[in-house]
Swiss-Prot record:
Membrane topology: Single-pass membrane protein
Keywords: Membrane, Thylakoid, Transmembrane, Transmembrane helix
Name under which the protein is recorded: Thylakoid membrane protein slr1796
Keyword Thylakoid part of the UniProt annotation: yes
Membrane-spanning segments: 16-36
Subcellular location: Cellular thylakoid membrane
InterPro entries: Thioredoxin-like_sf, Thylak_slr1796
GO cellular component: plasma membrane-derived thylakoid membrane
Length: 201
C-alpha cells in the first residue's frame, strides 16, 4: 500500500530532478561558451587598453570600414604612380587599436591623392625575400609600422609605433608641396607667382 502511494510520487520527483539538472547543465554550458569579457563583466566590451581581439580595428575603433580591404594593392598603386601609405597592424594589438583612428584621419585628408594600404602582418607570407611591389618587402617586424613611398616607389618615411597625426602629416605636406600647418590648417597646395617661386599670400 505504502509502496503504491510512494512510487508515483518518487517517479515525479525523479523526473523533476532530471529536468532541473539538465536545465542547469544547459545554462552552465551556454555560460561557459560566452566570450571571456561577457562572462566576467556582464557585457561585451571592446577595450583600447588591451591586446585582446575585438574585431577589425578600423571598423571597431575608427568607425571606418572602407580602409580594409584597401582600394588598391601595392602593385596597382605603383602602376598608377600614386604615393603609398603602408600601415602594418595586428587586430589584437592595443597600440594598433589606438593608431586606427590616426590612420582613418590620414584617409580623410589624403585618401584621394594617395593609396592608403593597411596590411595585417598575419597576411604576410612567411618567406625570406619579397618583391618591391609586395608589402612584406617594407615590413621590419613591429606594429604599428608606417611606411610612406613617393609616386616613384621611393621610401621617404619609415617609423614604428602609434604616431601622432602631425608627424605623418608633416611628411605628407612636404610630399604634396602643401603649406606648413602653421600657415594653413586646411590642406591647401602652395601657390607660386608665375614670375618667381616665392610663396604668394
Amino acid at each position: 500500500m505504502i509502496m503504491s502511494v510512494c512510487l508515483p510520487w518518487l517517479a515525479r520527483c525523479r523526473r523533476f530532478l532530471i529536468v532541473s539538472l539538465a536545465f542547469a547543465m544547459l545554462l552552465l554550458g551556454i555560460w561557459g561558451t560566452l566570450p571571456f569579457s561577457l562572462s566576467d563583466h556582464g557585457t561585451a566590451i571592446a577595450a583600447l587598453e588591451d591586446d585582446r581581439y575585438d574585431g577589425n580595428i578600423f571598423v571597431v575603433y575608427a568607425g571606418n570600414g572602407s580602409l580594409v580591404p584597401p582600394r588598391l594593392n601595392l602593385r596597382e598603386s605603383f602602376e598608377r604612380k600614386l604615393p603609398v601609405i603602408l600601415v602594418y597592424y595586428l587586430d589584437d594589438s592595443k597600440d594598433c587599436k589606438q593608431y586606427a583612428f590616426i590612420v582613418s584621419r590620414m584617409q580623410e585628408f589624403y585618401g584621394r591623392v594617395a593609396s592608403i594600404i593597411p596590411v595585417s602582418v598575419d597576411s604576410i607570407p612567411d618567406q625570406k625575400r619579397f618583391r618591391r611591389d609586395e608589402p612584406g618587402y617594407y615590413y621590419s617586424g613591429g606594429v604599428p609600422q608606417t611606411v610612406i613611398l613617393d609616386k616613384s616607389g621611393k621610401k621617404i618615411f619609415d617609423a614604428q609605433g602609434a604616431l601622432k597625426f602631425e608627424v605623418v602629416d608633416d611628411v605628407l605636406r612636404d610630399l604634396f608641396d602643401l603649406l606648413p600647418r602653421s600657415e594653413s590648417m586646411e590642406l591647401k597646395q602652395r601657390t607660386y607667382n608665375e614670375f618667381n617661386s616665392e610663396l604668394v599670400d
